[in-house]
């Protein structure tokens, strides 16, 4: 049996991942094989079994996930004359503005760095990583609510949606990072082999973001104030992270407190790699990894316990 999203229902352009897409054709021809997704709703089942069932279901729907990522990317630039070229124009304009304003007009300088573009590079590095985190976390904490109609009409693993959020966030980040790398090459600040350290930093940032965003997203289904509260928290969180300012300008006590900010650890690690072109403090990143693991475990446990009730609240 072939299952299709109801095309007669109005669908918002940016939030409807499956508009016009055939669920069965995206699921590795699951329809032809007679397979279907059956969520485990038995709360008394062992949690390890339930986790394994969800992982297997997500793998079976990998084609659906890839198609949804592609669909979201296409919808973003639907009816645009320049289309996907805007993915280059926006970050290029951002980096150019930062470079010109802070390096030429304001002539901002970074302590311990003499280069004219040092502060611009410092700022861009922090903002790029922060944007990756905030985009994934913000979208993940509303993804179930935004896709409520889809979840009610089509039977598929709900956890596919957060994976789509991460995929789209990483694609956009990759485009911006490539342009930023070009800027670093032009200014002679492109790091060498040490740049490989950015890969685990980026991966850890995305992991922490989706773990936090999904945890908040589940809570947001039951308590809608969670999303609004998190948006406010992010504004304070940005300024509590050394992105616009270097941590060295803060009093010693403030620097000690910032060390407990996982985003500060990630941002400063990336800035160390890009500006100082040295390996980051892996021990500092290890505790961020520990936080991500614990937060992921909390999120999985919350989803297994409250997931079956989400359908009634959406």
What does each model-found stretch correspond to?
Residues 17-27, 31-314:
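Hydrophobic transmembrane alpha-helices and immediately adjacent juxtamembrane helices
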């Amino acid at each position: 049996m072939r299952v299709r999203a109801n095309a007669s229902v109005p669908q918002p352009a940016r939030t409807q991942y499956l508009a016009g897409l055939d669920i069965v054709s995206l699921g590795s021809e699951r329809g032809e094989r007679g397979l279907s997704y059956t969520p485990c709703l038995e709360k008394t089942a062992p949690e390890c079994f339930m986790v394994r069932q969800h992982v297997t279901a997500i793998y079976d729907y990998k084609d659906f996930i890839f198609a949804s990522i592609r669909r979201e990317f296409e919808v973003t630039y639907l009816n645009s004359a320049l289309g996907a070229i805007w993915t280059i124009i926006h970050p290029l304009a951002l980096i150019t503005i930062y470079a010109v304003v802070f390096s030429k007009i304001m002539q901002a300088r970074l302590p311990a760095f003499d280069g004219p573009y040092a502060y611009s590079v410092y700022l861009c590095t922090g903002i790029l990583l922060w944007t990756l985190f905030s985009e994934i976390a913000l979208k993940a904490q509303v993804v179930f609510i935004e896709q409520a109609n889809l979840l009610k009409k089509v039977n598929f693993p709900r956890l596919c949606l957060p994976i789509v959020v991460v995929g789209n966030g990483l694609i956009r980040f990759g485009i911006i990072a490539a342009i930023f790398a070009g800027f670093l090459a032009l200014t002679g600040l492109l790091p060498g082999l040490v740049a490989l350290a950015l890969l685990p930093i980026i991966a850890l940032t995305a992991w922490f973001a989706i773990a936090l965003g999904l945890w908040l997203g589940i809570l947001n289904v039951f308590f809608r104030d969670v999303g609004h509260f998190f948006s406010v928290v992010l504004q304070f969180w940005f300024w509590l992270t050394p992105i616009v300012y270097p941590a060295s300008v803060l009093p010693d006590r403030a620097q000690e407190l910032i060390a407990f900010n996982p985003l500060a650890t990630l941002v400063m690690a990336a800035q160390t790699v890009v500006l100082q072109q040295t390996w980051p403090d892996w021990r500092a990143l290890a505790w961020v990894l520990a936080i991500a693991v614990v937060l992921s475990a909390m999120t999985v446990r919350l989803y297994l316990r409250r997931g079956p009730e989400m359908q009634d609240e959406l």
